[in-house]
Amino acid sequence: MAGHKIAHATLKGPSVVKELVIGLTLGLAAGGLWKMHHWNEQRKTRVFYDLLERGEIGVVVTEE
């Protein structure tokens, strides 16, 4: 019988360009999520102080 050729995966070193693209993509995604979180917190703070300034809410507990 003739020898069968089996395709084996050849191991290569890390691809620098691929690593940079993956790192950049993950970094931008994480940064975008962080900025969205930060903007949401800023909005909550701004709404709180607007309500406080208009007198609709108070931070002092009224005693009865």
Swiss-Prot record:
The keyword Transmembrane applies. Coiled coil: none annotated. The keyword Mitochondrion applies. It is found in: Mitochondrion inner membrane. The chain crosses the membrane at residues 15-34. This protein is one of the nuclear-coded polypeptide chains of cytochrome c oxidase, the terminal oxidase in mitochondrial electron transport. This is Probable cytochrome c oxidase subunit 5C-3. It comes from Arabidopsis thaliana (Mouse-ear cress).
